Structure formats: structure tokens, C-alpha cells
Amino acid sequence: MLRPPNPLVTIVAALAGLNWLHARAVRWAIRRNLTRLWAGDPEPLLATYVDDVHFTFPGRSSWAGEFRGKEEVARWLRRFVRVGLRFEVHEILVVGRPWDATLCLWFTDRLTDADGGVVYENRGTIMAKLAWGKIVSYEVNEDTQKVAALDAYLAAHGVNTAAAG
């Protein structure tokens, strides 16, 4: 298991042109925080957001919207956890300097029923802007028709689909 790099070393390395070390630190933090999210704890991930974070989820589903600020994003993330969605990270790419970095995360998310059958699966990307290790803005892009079908499945099975956490 990778140990987290010292933040000061990461900044100095990035300033010296060692962007790979900065990228490694960001990838490590994202994986750690997503693992905590799946365990039901969104707080470590939320701690990496600026207070006025901007999150976009396109489409015409109950998940879609423009969310501004940690509280709005926190409600969305808590709902994600409450519904039981799981997220598999395939790749995390990070480019740029600590004060202006771009992150691209390629993932598959899915929901299984009580018998372990997959009832929803979708592949997508997250594009994010970061500054000094904090997420400033991000957008999730995946098949919006599959997300709408997830809404229908949840409603048909009596799962609370209210967007509020």
C-alpha cells in the first residue's frame, strides 16, 4: 500500500518540475477518499473540496443538476451511498501544477440487488479542476439514459429517490 507523500515534498517537487509526484499524491488521496465514501463516510472526500465547489451532473434524472457548495454536494454524495451505488475506478490521470491541476477519472458505477445481480451499470468519466489539492469544480459524464433507468428501477422497488440527503 502506498504511503501518502508529505505535502511539502509534493509542492517542492512540483515546483521543481516533478509533476509525477504531485500526480501520485492526488491519485492516492482520491482512491483513499473514495474508499471511505463507499464505506459510508463522505467526510474525507468533502474535506478535499473548496467551500464553494461546483459540481455538475448532466441529464434529466433525479441525480442531475448543478450543485454549488459543500452542503449541496454532500447531500448528493450521501444519497449515492444510501442507495447503495458502488464505484470502480479504472484510471486516474492528473496533469498540471498544484495550483492549477486537471484530473480525469474513468470509472464504472453499479448497483446490485439483494441476490447480487447487477441492476444498474454505467461507465463514465469525471473531469475536475484542482488547486492546491482541493477540488474546485467537477463534472460527471456518463450515459444519462441509464441514469434515468436507474431512477425508474429505484421507484419501482420502493427506494427513496428524493435528492435530499
Question: What is each residue range found by the language model?
Answer:
Residues 2-6, 123-152:
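Short beta-strand edge/turn micro-motifs at domain boundaries
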Residues 33, 44-46, 53, 69, ...:
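Hydrophobic pocket/interface hotspot
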